[in-house]
Amino acid sequence: MSILAEKLSSILKRYDELTALLSSAEVISDIKKLTELSKEQSSIEEISIASKEYLSVLEGIKENKELLEDKELSELAKEELKILEIQKSELETAIKQLLIPKDPNDDKNIYLELRAGTGGDEAGIFVGDLFKAYCRYADLKKWKVEIVSSSENSVGGYKEIIALIKGKGVYSRLKFEAGTHRVQRVPETESQGRIHTSAITVAIMPEVDDVEVSINPSDLKIEVFRAGGHGGQCVNTTDSAVRITHLPTNISVSMQDEKSQHKNKDKALKILKARLYEKQIEEQQLANAKDRKEQVGSGDRSERIRTYNYPQNRLSEHRINLTLYSLEEIMLSGSLDEVINPLIAHAQSQFE
């Protein structure tokens, strides 16, 4: 038996063990254990199905090779072997992809955070434009988008947008969006036709629960204040806005979108946990990078990952030297898979 076949046999054995355990009274009565084992089985279900098919093909190849000695059946066996060898090759390719270590956060929902950087009003306008592109992409994927917080500027753009995106595989597809996105275009207010360069930062933070990120209440500084509108005018006569600071890391989150102080506090705490978890991920990625051939970006917000050049209708993905001359179509239709699929393929190739 080949090394691959042995590995697949052990995966199938574990899958069967989990099936038996999940039907046992002891596990059924233990919610934590039941959830843990269910997640493990779900994580190897796809590779288990492919493994069964692959081992069946190997058995078919073995049987047909034996039939080559039979004069009456040799021609039929030859034809069958051709088909089986093709199936074997296709399955091996698929299985290699399935065996790539899976990011434990890939199935999580995310908090998407876009912030205007250098470039003034134009950066704020691009925050809105890129957010719309992400919303269109989410529609294509049947994901749900909920704006958690937004801060508009005076020209119809945004200083910041934070949104919760829910759906299947959200983090797995959007995690490579983290970093600095640079835009080059002629602003509508530019009379001389000069191209302006501005930048925004994107953060992708997995939604986490209390088990994954535990915060000591004594590490939090919670402040309340009155919510302000455009130009600093007061829009609320009560102290409904909330700012929570995690003292050990100095990470701070402010929330004032809700009229209720309790709701603002709840939202701020969830985003704070997501930011702390994101920080853990960044630290882990830096540690793992030493053992990797290369990284598709560190996820660091300061890393310039992509340029959107409107005069040339060009999108340049700097991490994999990808250039596409269909920028406007991608932004208007939300067809970000043209960029995301090559990024995922490149990341997977680093494990081969």
Curated annotation (Swiss-Prot):
It comes from the Bacteria. Keywords: Cytoplasm, Methylation, Protein biosynthesis. Gene3D superfamilies: 3.30.160.20, 3.30.70.1660, 6.10.140.1950. Residues 288-309 are annotated as: Disordered. One of its GO terms (molecular function) is translation release factor activity, codon specific. It holds the Pfam family PCRF. Methylated by PrmC. Methylation increases the termination efficiency of RF1. This is Peptide chain release factor 1. It comes from Helicobacter pylori (strain P12). The lineage of its organism: Bacteria, Pseudomonadati, Campylobacterota, Epsilonproteobacteria, Campylobacterales. The gene is prfA.
